[in-house]
Amino acid sequence: VNLGNELTPTQVKNQPTKVSWDAEPGALYTLVMTDPDAPSRKNPVFREWHHWLIINISGQNVSSGTVLSDYIGSGQPKGTGLHRYVFLVYKQPGSITDTQHGGNRPNFKVMDFANKHHLGNPVAGNFFQAKHED
């Protein structure tokens, strides 16, 4: 994943093995992966579809966090063009004890989640694009 590069669904079907950002020692973070283009950029009626949500990550140790939504790779419908898949990292003001992610995968609003948990603005982000493989 490198700032908008195009990847195939096959390349991203498995959970990433390396996710990194400039983390403060002892700080807790939230990581979310979302598709703002569901089911398509022209008609994003399911905006946003979240593909991954982890809270209470200690530093950059993603495996130390609490998984609220397991990773799902890109799976865009045929004929819907390129979708953006956005990774955002938020520094938490403290541990999050509410383990409800606030909705189903479609129509998830990362900003609403961030506001609910007082996360402020993202401290890191990246994205890739993918489209249906024929």
Curated annotation (Swiss-Prot):
It holds the Pfam family PBP. It comes from the Eukaryota. Signal peptide: none annotated. InterPro entries: PEBP (IPR008914), PEBP-like_sf (IPR036610), PEBP_euk (IPR035810), Phosphatidylethanolamine-bd_CS (IPR001858). Belongs to the phosphatidylethanolamine-binding protein family. This is Protein D3. It comes from Onchocerca volvulus.
